[in-house]
């Protein structure tokens, strides 16, 4: 794997992820301004992409490591937005909206974990294989 292919895979994935995140913000954030739904959707979709990728890469022998870099480091990394989430959470805290802040924190963190596991489950069901999670 040459460095130029690594850079290209990550860059292409990150560009697509960032454009998708921007589009989600434009399309969804105006729906319910107190809770930026576009940011939440971006983080949840990115977590699902990571779960699917982790599970899929583990079941396909010989798959180029570039796919993992493209999907997780690039696409999911460009799509997810911890910095925007943190800024939005801080804004709610500064306004004294503690309940909304706690709800937003729970939705982002709990939802992301749930969607990552759902992504892994999806591949497990499609492949009729195990999740790879310790029981």
From Swiss-Prot:
* Binding positions (Na(+)): 77, 80
GO-annotated molecular function: fluoride channel activity; metal ion binding
Domain of life of the organism in this record?
Answer: Bacteria
Q: Which GO terms describe its cellular component?
A: plasma membrane
**How does its record describe regulation of its activity?**
Na(+) is not transported, but it plays an essential structural role and its presence is essential for fluoride channel function.
Q: Which residues cross the membrane?
A: 7-27, 37-57, 70-90, 105-125
Location of the protein in the cell:
Cell inner membrane
GO process annotations (BP):
cellular detoxification of fluoride
State the InterPro entries in the record. Answer: FluC
Function according to Swiss-Prot or TrEMBL: Fluoride-specific ion channel. Important for reducing fluoride concentration in the cell, thus reducing its toxicity.
PANTHER family xref list: FLUORIDE EXPORT PROTEIN 1-RELATED
State the HAMAP family in the record. FluC (MF_00454)
Say which family it is in: Belongs to the fluoride channel Fluc/FEX (TC 1.A.43) family.
| Record-given protein name | Fluoride-specific ion channel FluC
State the species of origin. Answer: Xanthomonas oryzae pv. oryzae (strain MAFF 311018)
Q: From the UniProt record, report the name of the gene that encodes this protein.
A: fluC
